[in-house]
Amino acid sequence: MYPVFLYQITDIRTEPLFMFLVTATLYFFLRGLQSASIAHPLLAGVSVSLASLTRPVALILIPFLAICYMIRPGIRAKKMTALIFCFLIGVLITLAPWTIRNYIKYGEVILVNNAGGYNFWRGSSKEMYELTTIKDQAAFSTASEQFETDHQRTITREVNESADSPMARSRVWRRRGLENIKDHPELYFRYSLKKAVNYWRLWLNPQEYGKTKALMSALIFVPLYVLGFIGLLGYRKTNPWIFRFIIFYFLLFWVAHIPFQVVIRFRIPVTDPILLVFTGRAVRVFFQNLR
């Protein structure tokens, strides 16, 4: 049993459900390529929409998977059309009711929610960057609490007073985020690089969890990622399409998270279930070579 998954399901957050749904999406997507059943692409569309309703970042999988259906070698045009059609039907019947509900209630097209602008503002904030430079755990905790309760609360009140609808508020947040970038371009560049690196950090944040827990987490993450990528590399020649698909899948979520706040618990649902599979392959090949 993977300790990280066991820990996550004891916490009330979206990641465990999101992990299940994106993993199910990949399963049904890949099964759809191998079978003639229309159920698999349909269920892939349903799963990716449910994942998007859990965490909107999964919306990027909809065009990605549709394109992958189109460029998969060896699929005839008729089957490709059927796969894409069933996939998009699954997306539509799952996502449309919520979007329609939002339009009826707010008079605006809101696919999932209006948090994009707010999250972009957080990911461009000078104060958020300064938090990442604090080394002491107690000082980090105090500064984080002050940011959430004082600075953010003040700006939230200003945004709510200046806009009267969900998407209008999101646009105000986005505009403030762009102003952050304009006012501090070098800082934003450094922060973006830091977020890009931290996304792949193989230990918990010592600022938040302390050095001991960070070290213990590294003893779990490092072997998984080393063995997982070794197992994945084994597919580079035996199944190059799967190899490229998984690599692009990982990179897609990586790039999508960089403009926003980055913590490794956002990476885990995307990468770790897949790498566990490839870790199993790497271990199996290792023991076969010992015989």
State where each predicted segment sits.
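Hydrophobic transmembrane alpha-helices of multi-pass, membrane-embedded glycosylation machinery
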Residues: 61-72, 271-277
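Membrane-proximal stem/loop segments at transmembrane-domain junctions that anchor or position
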Residues: 111-194
